A protein has these predicted regions:
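Short, Lys/Arg-enriched, disordered terminal segments
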Residues: 1-4, 358, 464-466
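Bacterial Sec-dependent N-terminal signal peptides
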Residues: 1-21, 384, 388
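Beta-strand/loop edge motif enriched in small/polar residues
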Residues: 19-285, 290-385
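Acidic/polar, low-complexity intrinsically disordered N-terminal segments immediately downstream
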Residues: 39-41, 387, 395-400
Length: 466
């Protein structure tokens, strides 16, 4: 059936209103103009291979809502050729429904058929009330989609694209899922974006970089995504992070969340502020929690995992949290001697630490008592001897590390990949070494460092004057 376009001209009080009904196949290069807008989609549209549909800035494409609640009946725009929809800041291109009721998704979305050579250029658009949002049927390694000043609202999924995605000044509002899973390929990069009242903001991307973004009133924000999150705010969400691993969270602000960070391991959380959360941080194995201010939450830090001594909790202020400043939910012993609890009274500090003294199924926690400035240690509270060397050498079944002058010697049983970090998570070395002894000439400031191997094992040592 050939594509049928009907043009309606309605006159009222001397003013003419245009709308164009469209459906079916696009078999030749076609432009939808602002003069013909809005375009009322009465049947699904397919742009065929080798053909281009260009939509001018300021156009509205309005899909007729389906009320059967059967997605098989939903109308869609399928791209087997090329779609060019590049709006402007003043004249965005709008893909919407004839019924924009909140929470009602009633058209299918924009489907990019990469398997047939389909491509899209989309920018400065509004997308709302779609079920699948914008999706592609095959991964697009190397493909880049740039979205600037876009708005994604009331979609079941806003975007399901296995490609490299860049968002700038975009808003994700009241979606089921904002940026959906990238199971095979893809990355997400967002700068100065807002995520509000979504059920889930970002899920299972292969790599994310978020800078200067705000997350408010979402049920879930970031699920299972490694990457870097810097200078972002998470306010009044249920879960800010969950099933998180391999992330660097730097200079962020967490306020009023049920859980700030629910972290599974191998992450760095630094220079951030946590306040008014029910639980600020759930910390897994092989992670760094450094230089954070964690105050006035229900619980400050819950330490979990199977090897809590592999997590480095250093130089934080853990103060005035209602239930506990620190809760050990494992049966392992560890120490937090470089953290300040904002009190010089050991009884007050003990009341804020939940460990084996409170529940014999839990391990014990050693700590230090600081003065009111949190700058000077007054004394140590050692509940259990951990037999952890404070400096070099440090020995386990596969490692031996020692320092000679300004050289670090590493002895390993098997070939491995190593990384060298400082306590803030900054990487100074990433190197493959052979079995046996390796000599590393390093220019490092005096201090505490961590050496990790490819299996996630981390080993703390002191580097400096002998």
């Amino acid at each position: 059936m050939k594509k049928l376009i009907t043009l309606f001209i309605i006159f009222s009080v001397g003013i003419s209103f245009f709308q164009t009904s469209v459906s079916g196949g696009i078999y030749q290069n076609t432009t939808w103009t602002t003069a013909g807008s809005p375009y009322i989609v009465t049947g699904s549209i397919v742009v065929f291979p080798g053909k281009t549909l260009t939509i001018e800035p300021g156009c509205e494409v309005r899909f007729t809502a389906d009320y059967s609640f059967n997605t098989g009946n939903f109308l869609y725009l399928e791209i087997r050729g090329t779609l060019v929809a590049l709006g402007t800041d003043a004249n965005k291109i709008k893909f919407t429904s004839s019924d924009t009721t909140d929470g009602f998704q009633n058209w299918l979305g924009i489907s990019i058929k990469g398997s047939q050579g389909g491509t899209c250029q989309l920018d400065r658009i509004v997308l709302q009330n779609a079920w699948n949002g914008i999706s592609n049927d095959v991964p697009e390694p190397g493909a880049i989609y740039n979205f600037t000043n876009c708005r994604f609202k009331n979609n079941n999924y806003a975007l399901q694209l296995n490609a490299d995605l860049y968002y700038t000044n975009c808003v994700f509002e009241k979606n089921g899922v904002g940026q959906a899973a990238q199971n095979i390929y893809g990355s997400m990069n967002a700068t100065n974006c807002q995520f509000t009242q979504n059920f889930c903001s970002v899920t299972w991307s292969n790599s994310i970089t978020l800078v200067d973004c705000i997350f408010t009133g979402n049920t879930n924000n970031i699920i299972g995504c490694p990457g870097t999150i810097q200078n972002c705010s998470f306010i009044n969400n249920d879960l800010a992070f969950t099933e998180t691993f391999g992330v660097q969270i730097i200079d962020c602000f967490f306020d009023g969340n049920n859980v700030g960070i629910d972290e599974n391991g191998s992450s760095t959380i630094s220079n951030s502020v946590f306040t008014n959360n029910s639980i600020a941080v759930k910390l897994g194995d092989n992670s760094f929690l450094t230089n954070n201010t964690i105050t006035n939450n229900g619980t400050g830090v819950q330490v979990r995992g199977t090897n809590p001594s592999s997590a480095q909790i250093m130089y934080n202020q853990l103060c005035n949290n209602v239930n506990y400043n620190l809760e050990n939910i494992t049966d392992k012993n560890f120490q937090v001697n470089t953290n300040c609890f904002c009190s010089s009274d050991s009884a007050t500090i003990e009341n804020g630490i939940y460990d084996g003294y409170d529940d014999i199924t839990r391990g014990l926690v050693n700590y230090a008592i600081y003065d009111d400035s949190c700058a000077n240690i007054l004394s140590y509270v050692t509940k259990v001897e951990l037999n952890e060397p404070a400096g070099l050498p440090e020995l386990n079944t596969t490692w031996k590390i020692w320092q000679v002058n300004d050289e670090l010697h590493v002895l390993v049983e098997n070939e491995t990949q190593i990384q060298l970090f400082d306590i803030a998570g900054n990487i100074f070395l990433n190197k493959a070494i052979l079995a046996g002894e390796t000599l590393l000439k390093l220019e490092l400031a005096t201090g505490i460092y961590m050496l990790s191997d490819q299996n996630g094992n981390r080993h703390k040592f002191y580097f400096g004057n002998q």
